[in-house]
Each structure stands twice: as C-alpha cells, then as structure tokens.
C-alpha cells in the first residue's frame, strides 16, 4: 500500500498538522511507501516536502511503539511451504544476531511474503528479473539486488552474502538468513532456509555444492 499526503506543501514550506498526522498514521499502519505528487512535481517547496516526509518516517520508525504495532498486525494465514519458510526466517532474525534476510525470487512473491512478516532486519531481494526488481522497489523494508541465474546452492549462498555486504547490511563477522527454491530459477519453489556466515572462506569450507 502507498500513503498519499495532502497538498498544503505545494504553496507553503511546512505541512499542516493533519498532513503530518496522515503520513505518520500510514507508516504506523505498515504502508509500503508514502508518496508525494503535486508537492514535488509542481509545488514551490519540493525539497522541503521530501525532507519533511523523510523526517516523519524516521521519527515514527524510531518510536518503540512502532515495532509493537507492526508486530501486532501480523495476522496473515500461512498455508504453503513458502509461508512457513518466510515466517521461520523472520523468527530466526528476531531471536538471533542476524543482520538481513536475503531471498531469491523470480516473480517477487517470496519477497512480498517476507515483507508481510515485517521483520526487524532489512530484506534483500535477489532476482535476475529486472521487472521484478522494479516492482519490489517500493516494497516495505526491501532492497533489490540484481543477480544472475544460479545453478548451484553454494553459488547462491555466496551471491546472497555479497549482496548483503555490498548494501552495507552486514560485515564478514555477521550472519544472514537466506531463502531460496530448488530447483533454481523456477517461480514458486521456495523450499530452503539457510543461516549463512558472511565469510566466504567459511561458506566454501562448510556448504555443499
């Protein structure tokens, strides 16, 4: 979902209280994105409008109540293997020192399922499909990394780790959770969860091909 704010900042450098409240409420409710339209396209204060939106988002997400509300909103039905995998990924991330959840996704469905769980760590969506990457660009908590098609599990683990490192979510001493599907490169096959070190030497010495 995308939250759309009012248009007061088309002509003024500050929003009304109602507009700030609308933006904050959208974020508290777990909106994937908050959107400006005329304020940035034709308004007199486009930079101020963007900065105001950013400030409100940062303030809301730093509120301890925000996580409580987000966690209380988890009520989706879980009927598939993929549902169970992403739920487990979120629980592992919340109970251990995990820095990110990396998921391989062709259609974008797995990334959306993880975003629905609203984990406390960043989501890194690994995909070889540019259209999928574009669709996921506004998804809650998700950053997309383009990745070539994978044929082997170890190759997929290494690529996911490199994606988390390149985005600054983890260092070599950290761990991430990886979800994927075997056989690779086929939509709807998410069936693997792996907790992986971000040290490639350890991966090559421990992981199967």
Describe the residue ranges of each PLM region:
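Phosphate-interacting basic helix/loop segments used at nucleotide- and nucleic-acid interfaces
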Residues: 84-98, 157-168, 174
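Long, charged amphipathic helices and adjacent flexible linkers at domain junctions
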Residues: 53-90, 206-209
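C-terminal helical cap(s) of enzyme catalytic domains, especially alpha/beta-barrels
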Residues: 40-63, 192-195
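Flexible, glycine/charged-enriched surface loops at secondary-structure junctions
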Residues: 37-38, 43, 62-73, 99, ...
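Nucleotide-binding motor/catalytic cores of P-loop/tubulin-like NTPases across gene-expression machines
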Residues: 110-112, 118-155
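Glycine-rich phosphate-binding active-site loops on the catalytic face of alpha/beta enzymes
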Residues: 22-46
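C-terminal binding/interaction regions
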Residues: 162, 171-184, 189-202
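Single conserved hydrophobic/aromatic residue that forms the stacking wall/gate
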Residues: 1-6, 10-11
């Amino acid at each position: 979902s995308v939250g759309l704010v009012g248009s007061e900042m088309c002509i003024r450098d500050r929003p009304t209280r109602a507009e700030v409240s609308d933006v904050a409420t959208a974020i508290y409710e777990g909106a994937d994105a908050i959107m400006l339209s005329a304020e940035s396209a034709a308004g007199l204060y486009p930079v101020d409008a963007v900065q105001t939106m950013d400030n409100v988002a940062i303030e809301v997400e730093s509120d301890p109540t925000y996580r409580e509300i987000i966690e209380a909103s988890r009520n989706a039905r879980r009927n598939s293997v993929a549902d169970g995998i992403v739920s487990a990924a979120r629980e592992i991330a919340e109970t251990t020192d995990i820095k990110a959840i990396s998921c391989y996704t062709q259609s974008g469905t797995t990334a959306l399922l993880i975003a629905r769980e609203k984990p406390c760590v960043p989501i890194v969506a690994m995909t070889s499909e540019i259209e999928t990457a574009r669709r996921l660009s506004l998804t809650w908590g998700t950053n997309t990394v383009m990745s070539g098609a994978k044929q082997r599990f170890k190759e997929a683990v290494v690529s996911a780790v490199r994606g988390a490192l390149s985005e600054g979510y983890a260092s070599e001493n950290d761990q991430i959770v990886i979800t994927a599907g075997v056989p690779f490169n086929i939509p709807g096959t998410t069936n693997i969860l792996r907790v992986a070190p971000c040290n490639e030497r350890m991966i090559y010495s421990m992981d199967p091909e």
